[in-house]
Structure formats: C-alpha cells, structure tokens
Amino acid sequence: KYVVFLFYTYKIGIMNKLSREKMCKKEKKEILRILLPPIFTFLLNSVVYWGAPLIKTGIVAHNLSSSVDRIVPFMPQFIIIYFGCYIFWVVNYLLIAAQKEEHRYQFFTADFYARLICFVCFVFFPTTNTRPELTGSDIFTGAVRFLYQIDKPVNLFPSIHCMASWFCCIGLRKCENIPKWYQNLSEIIAVLVFISTLALRQHVLVDVFSGILVAEATWQIS
C-alpha cells in the first residue's frame, strides 16, 4: 500500500507540474497576443512618420492654416497634454488588444489602413505650418522649444496625434468590460489632445478633422 501511495503521489506531482507548465505557456501566449499588435503599430508608425520625409517628390508643401486657426491662442501649457497623450495611447491600445479577437482584429486592421493613408498623404500632399517665435523662459515654453527642435513642421495632414487619440475612443466602443466612465474620460482626453495640437501650433483645424475622419472611415471599412 505504501508503494501504491508513493506511486499515486508521484503521478499527481507530475500531473500538477505539467498543468503548471501548460498554464505558463498559455499565459505567455496571452501576453504575446496582447503585446504584439501595439508593438507592430508602434513600429509601423515610426516607418510612416520618419520614412515619409525621406522620399523626395519635389512637391511644394501646402500651408492649410486659415483665419479660424489664428483665433486659438498659443498656450504652451498644453505641452503637458501633448506629451502626456503617449501614456494615454499605450494604455488604451493595450486595453483594446486585450479584447475579443474579432474586435481586436477590426481595430488593428483599421489602424493599419489609417497609417498607410497617412503615409500616402505625407508623401504626395506634404503640408507645413507657421510656428510662433518663442521668447518665454518658463518651463512650458522651454518644453515647446524642445518639441520644435525634434519635430519639424512636416507630416501634418492628417494629424497622427488626433487620429491615434480618436482611435483610443473608437476601440473602446461597445466594450462592456470597459467602464462607461473610462470611455467618457477617453473622449475628454482625446478632445484635449485636439486642442493641444492647435494651441501649440503643431497642427491646424484641417489636420485635426482629417485625422478624426481617417480613423472613423478605416474603422467602418475594416
């Protein structure tokens, strides 16, 4: 009986070990399933944003600013929103990647199409804008000065900042496991991002609305 007991104890131990290994593999697979789509999106965005200016077409850049854009005052404090939205994107894209497969596939397919549209626009319809002369010495103006140094006035139409922020709202629609308050908060943050792009003179109204339109259109056809 003692031998039988040892045998069954050993058997149970082996089964538990195999079960744990199986669970571990399943967890790793789930983590990869969530992480890979956002990582691919980040890489594609880098190719689009930094690759488009390398293609020289000789097309003169258009300035799409209007008198309405000049109504919005320059507000360097919005640099907090402009830089902070990267955290917003990471959080929401991971939340969306954790949804059901059909929803996740539709979202990242739409995002893929949208980035390609941006690439085509950046190459064949280049735009630029006029930035203000920065004279302040406060921390916010200093941050905007840094932004202007690392981000030249190219790749403006449509606005990727606005497009990605609106995608963060689109991707949470009809997600019953995401609280309604967070969906509403995401919409508020997205609107603040829109305002920040205008207040910092990074974009004009046409860029903002085109970014939203591209996100909505690609979502509908995906």
Protein language model regions, located:
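Aromatic-anchored segments of alpha-helical transmembrane domains
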Residues: 46-47, 115-121, 188-199
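Alpha-helical transmembrane segments of integral membrane proteins
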Residues: 29, 33-41, 105-113, 182-186, ...
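N-terminal transmembrane-helix/juxtamembrane module of multi-pass inner/ER membrane proteins
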Residues: 16-88, 144
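Interfacial helix-loop-helix junctions of multi-pass membrane proteins
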Residues: 153-157, 192-218
